[in-house]
Every structure is written in C-alpha cells, then in structure tokens.
A protein has these predicted regions:
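Conserved ABC ATPase signature
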Residues: 141-145, 149
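Q-loop/switch helix immediately C-terminal to the Walker
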Residues: 91, 99-112
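Conserved catalytic motifs of ABC-family nucleotide-binding domains
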Residues: 162
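Conserved ABC ATPase "signature" region
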Residues: 119-137
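Conserved beta-strand-loop-alpha-helix hinge in the C-terminal portion
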Residues: 222-245
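H-loop/switch region of ABC-family ATPase nucleotide-binding domains
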Residues: 202-203
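ABC ATPase nucleotide-binding domains
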Residues: 237-272
Length: 272
C-alpha cells in the first residue's frame, strides 16, 4: 500500500530550507495510521505527497525512495490519483467544486467525472451521504452549509470516490468531539468493508488514539518515532496537544515498565 524508506524531500539548491524526512513508513491495506505534530511539523506537506501532489510541491527527492499504491512517490498529479486517493483538508469550503448548486450534485461530481454509469453514481452518492449523515442536506447549496455540515459533505464527496487511501488532514476541525467520534466510526465501517487504508493527520492525540493502530510523530519535518501507541507516547513532541493530566503522567512514568493501554487514554479523554 505505502512504503517510504528513508525518504527525504526538500530543495536541492537550498539545502538549508525546510526538509521533510527521513521518513520510514509502512502501511498495509485497511490499516489506520495517525501522523501527529504541531504547526510547522510538515503534516500537510506529507499529506500532499501521499495524495499524489508531487508536481505541485516543487521539491526534490534528496534521499531514499517511496511507493504509494504501487506508484513511485513522485509520479503523476493530484487529479491523476483522485480515483484511488482522497485528501480531505481542514477548510471544507475550499474543497467544493464551485460548479454545483446542491449537496447531492456536489457529492456526485467526482464519481460522474470518472465516467461511471448513472446507476453506479447514484448508488455511490446515496451510500456516501448516508454514511456521513448528510442526506437531509441533499437539496441545500454547498455554500449555505455550516462548517460542520460542510465537513460532513466533503467527507461524503471523498467516500463517494471509493478510495483505496483516505487522507484526513485535520478534517474534523469544525465538528464537536462527539460528532467526530460518530464520523470516525462510520469511516471505520467503510474501511473494514472496503479495505481502504486511512491516515489521520492531527495536532491532538484525540481522536486518533481510539481508532489508529500505528502512530508517526513529526516535529519540524523530522520523524521522531513510528509504531504502536505505547512505543511512541514517550516521544510525543511538546506541540502535540494533550490534556494536562495525561502529559504529567507521561513525564513521570517510565515507558520501559509502564505500558499505556487504550483504556488509560479513554479515561483521560472522558472529559471530552
């Protein structure tokens, strides 16, 4: 699915500028990966790379290699990969097509441009809107939606494409914690049924801790750690947002002798 081996990208002519990497990532079909880091960590740059936007990055491969869904990491453009890779970003209104006058047409826009038969387009639209709880919005204009409604519709647009890789780049920023949990449970169901791999890019450990099997920590473009939750928690950069109680606990406990099970994290995040 995804294999990045020592991959480092940046500017060959300006080696002192921001670099991303070296990155070592292995993601299998159906797996969920959380990429955690603060502002400026390189999360969105990595998201664009994974989505297939290499040609828009204007960067160079400085070291290593990468394969994403069987393709070299530096091949093609975003639109060439849209049928199998979907990237949902933080600002939903910027992701609307701008040429549809209803939510139903917006969700149908992508599948229709794949040249699918009308019955298949309609099935995908119906399934995706039901999954994202936005059937009641079908006749609304996309630009009349609230922030939370718009994010659910953009997620429906992505799922209607039936992707093999779904990249969620702070895609729940306008949803409440409860609504975020609901949406992620729905996406988990889709992932289990389709084999779609999911990557969450977040500043917060919540909600990724509840849904992801693997975690990658980024700080100023550097990969600090990658592995299961208990393996990466001791390496969390200060700019990853935690509750004060959890951060204090991580500072005093010895990770070699005290594992951090998900039950412990759920207790800390019960306040959310």
């Amino acid at each position: 699915m995804i294999s990045l081996q020592g991959l480092t990208i940046g500017h060959t002519a300006h080696p002192d500028h921001f670099q991303l990497g070296p990155l070592d990532i292995e993601l299998k079909e159906g797996e969920w990966l959380a990429i955690l880091g603060g502002n400026g960590a390189g999360k969105s740059l990595l998201a664009q790379l994974l989505a297939g936007g290499w040609s828009q990055l204007h960067l160079d491969t400085l070291a290593g290699e990468g394969v994403i869904l069987g393709q070299p990491h530096d091949s093609g453009q975003l639109n060439h990969h849209a049928a199998v890779r979907q990237w949902v970003q933080q600002s939903p209104y910027l992701q609307f097509s701008g040429c549809c006058f209803s939510v139903a047409d917006e969700v149908a826009f992508g599948p229709a441009n794949l040249g699918l038969l009308p019955d298949e387009v309609n099935r995908r639209v119906s399934d995706a809107m039901a999954l994202c709880h936005c059937k009641a919005l079908a006749a609304r204009h996309p630009l009349d939606l609230s922030g939370g409604e718009a994010q659910r519709v953009v997620l429906a647009c992505a799922l209607a494409m039936a992707p093999k890789l779904l990249i969620l780049d702070q895609a729940f920023s306008r949803l409440t914690p409860a609504a975020t949990q609901t949406m992620l449970r729905q996406i988990r169901r889709y992932s289990e049924e389709s084999g779609c791999s999911v990557i969450l890019l977040e500043q917060r450990l919540f909600p990724a801790a509840h849904f992801c099997e693997r975690f990658l920590l980024l700080d100023h473009g550097r990969q600090l750690a990658c592995g299961e939750l208990g393996e990466v928690l001791p390496h969390l950069p200060g700019r990853v947002i935690l509750t004060d109680s959890l951060r204090e606990t991580l500072q005093v406990r010895d990770p070699r002798h005290h594992p951090y099970p998900l039950a412990m994290l759920r207790e800390f995040y019960a306040e959310l």
